Amino acid sequence: MAPNAPFARSLRLQRLHHHDPDRLFIVPLDHSITDGPLSRAHRLDPLVGELASHHVDGIVLHKGSLRHVDPEWFTRTSLIVHLSASTVHAPDPNAKYLVSSVEESLRMGADAVSVHVNLGSEGERHQIADMAAVAEACDRWNVPLLAMMYPRGPKIDDPRDPALVAHAVQVAVDLGADLVKTLYVGSVAAMAEITAASPVPVVVVGGPRDSDESRILAYVDDALRGGAAGVAMGRNVFQAPDPGAMADKLSDLIHNSGTRGAARAPAGAAAGAA
């Protein structure tokens, strides 16, 4: 937890960690605005209930979706309201816009909010300004902020370049994020350098759908060995043949992993173990 966070913000951060004070398993269900209806979208409420019952720490949703979800599920997991949006049909899908506010999210019962920034995109300046404004509102209301940071734009050749990912994490930290979601760079040692340098927890993205379950679990294990605090994995959970079973396997790996000692380890130590 942030050492200088006010009581209310610290309390909300602790509530996010339902099963472990150091690790997080988040399932974003915010893809539908960007890509269209989710798989099983007509069953959003039971899907959220299934995830909440299988050791997921937090679920990311857009504000309108909450009208169609039983609040009971969020006595078992945390609600993260996503404030950013764009669609794949836009002239620039990387241009994210704010579609909600911290205050509105609080009225809906949010435990935290999230914003999306595409570092290097043509709309970067607006997204950074939006995140700064959201961070100020989070300070005013003592609400945890999850920053989803992606190197993504016309000058970005390799979005997993460790220097770019480190820069994205630093932008989030400097603007006031409590948690950062970003890309796994593909190397345990390189990821360990990024996570060790970050004063806030870093969770890695789940990425595109992969039908190979063992490959998904190996990816998460590598990220944890690289010091990640956990994952924010959507499609590889909610598009799995059995989302609850997949959530259980990921939760067990994240919360009961033998790599726990490597989490947020000094970069040199992690590199030696890689």
UniProtKB/Swiss-Prot annotation:
EC number: 4.1.2.56
CDD domains per the UniProt record, alphabetical: DhnA
Comment on activity versus temperature: Optimum temperature is 40 degrees Celsius.
GO annotation, biological process: amino acid biosynthetic process; aromatic amino acid family biosynthetic process
Pfam family membership, one: DeoC
Alphabetical UniProt keywords: Amino-acid biosynthesis, Aromatic amino acid biosynthesis, Lyase
Note from the entry: 2-amino-4,5-dihydroxy-6-one-heptanoic acid-7-phosphate can be converted to 5-acetyl-1H-pyrrole-2-carboxylic acid (5,2-APC) by a non-enzymatic reaction.
Record carries keyword Endoplasmic reticulum: no
Identification of the protein by name: 2-amino-4,5-dihydroxy-6-oxo-7-(phosphonooxy)heptanoate synthase
pH-dependence of activity, as noted: Optimum pH is 6.5-10.0.
Catalysed reactions, semicolon-separated: 2-amino-4,5-dihydroxy-6-oxo-7-(phosphooxy)heptanoate = L-aspartate 4-semialdehyde + dihydroxyacetone phosphate
UniProt-listed SMART domains: DeoC
Family named by the database record: Belongs to the DeoC/FbaB aldolase family. GriI subfamily.
Record's function text: Catalyzes aldol condensation between L-aspartate-4-semialdehyde (ASA) and dihydroxyacetone phosphate (DHAP), to form 2-amino-4,5-dihydroxy-6-oxo-7-(phosphonooxy)heptanoate.
MF-aspect GO terms: fructose-bisphosphate aldolase activity
UniProt cross-references to NCBIfam families, sorted A to Z: PRK07226.1
Subunit structure, as described in the record: Homodecamer.
